[in-house]
Amino acid sequence: MTEAMKITLSTQPADARWGDKATYSINNDGITLHLNGKDDLGLIQRAARKIDGLGIKQVALTGEGWDTERCWAFWAGYKGPKGVRTVMWPDLDDAQRQELDNRLTIIDWVRDTINAPAEELGPEQLAQRAVDLLCSVACDSVTYRITKGEDLREQNYMGLHTVGRGSERPPVLLALDYNPTGDKDAPVYACLVGKGITFDSGGYSIKQSAFMDSMKSDMGGAATVTGALAFAITRGLNKRVKLFLCCADNLISGNAFKLGDIIRYRNGKNVEVMNTDAEGRLVLADGLIDASAQHPRLIIDMATLTGAAKTALGNDYHALFSFDDTLAGRLLTSAAQENEPFWRLPLAEFHRNQLPSNFAELNNTGSATYPAGASTAAGFLSHFVENYREGWLHIDCSATYRKAPVEQWAAGATGLGVRTIANLLTA
């Protein structure tokens, strides 16, 4: 068996022969990472990516200076979608090791689930995986209901049914109740709503191949909020939280929805479809209606919703939208505490009115007259949140997935956002 490469930390610069910008050096004893006190976690993550690029698949983190955050930064960069990597972790106290183990279990579940091929992960499989994860951490406190196919239409989940009816794999709504109180009448503290589009072709507003090839990841919001709830439970979440995953394929067929169709929602809103590739908001609307009916103190929806958010922030930040300044500030505080990247983008009352339709109350997409696509998408969703000005956060999760590797991430899912939402739930 190959001996593990030893990885140590140092606050001293590398030998001058490595250059004055060297972040790591190699000697007979292994690899040394040279911390500079400026962005040590980022330095460790980037170095881990380089170590993986050298083909080193077994490492041992040794010596002083390793803690949970530094171990996790190393793993975030070291993990990739292909092959097996083995890490021998340093000695940590029980609390730190438990935290690390929970991250390895749950956030890796999120990354692996998002990376799974669409052929293997349809709407029903995604819902069942979410149930399995949450039952693995708190089965005695979890109940759930899965509604699919024609049952959705009969129960007036018209957005989800309309988007998903074009696929042979029926659309699915997972409604999961985490209630650790034992009181079936306990108030619901929070609702999490996730977009679970397991493959997005764009429908009849079809995507080009260059924009479709990563669309197995269009369920990243659903996977992330599922992981966030599971992770919050491992951190001691003792409040009742409900999870709604809106899962579907968006495909082309003789039964697929078309431009000009009008969707009539349970809350009385009518929406004209003018872009079948703006389907995420159509399925989320059903989840938000259900979430609002619980009258929680907090609603968080998460979705890979718009290219506009990605244009603004790249894959480096999740975009945050809210009318509730206090709540937005709390989430940004949680993000800072967890070293995760979130950035707030504008959401104003006028964005709610920038989706005009000649035939319905709302259009499902903006026009060239109103080009702030990420903000108008958030404005659209607000029509399905009963008290949208308080207690609601919308996250357009641009940092969920990377099509190609970069200096700190392998190609594929990142798992970013799990810790921040869990932090907010347990604060």
UniProtKB/Swiss-Prot annotation:
Mn(2+) 2 binds at K195, D200, D218, E279. Its EC number is 3.4.11.23. InterPro entries: Leucine_aapep/pepB (IPR011356), M17_PepB-like_N (IPR047620), Pept_M17_PepB (IPR008330), Peptidase_M17_C (IPR000819). It holds the Pfam family Peptidase_M17. Keywords: Aminopeptidase, Cytoplasm, Hydrolase, Manganese, Metal-binding, Protease. SUPFAM superfamilies: Zn-dependent exopeptidases. Binds 2 manganese ions per subunit. One of its GO terms (molecular function) is metalloaminopeptidase activity. The active site is at K207, R281. GO terms for cellular component: cytoplasm. GO terms for biological process: proteolysis. Probably plays an important role in intracellular peptide degradation. This is Peptidase B. The lineage of its organism: Bacteria, Pseudomonadati, Pseudomonadota, Gammaproteobacteria, Enterobacterales.
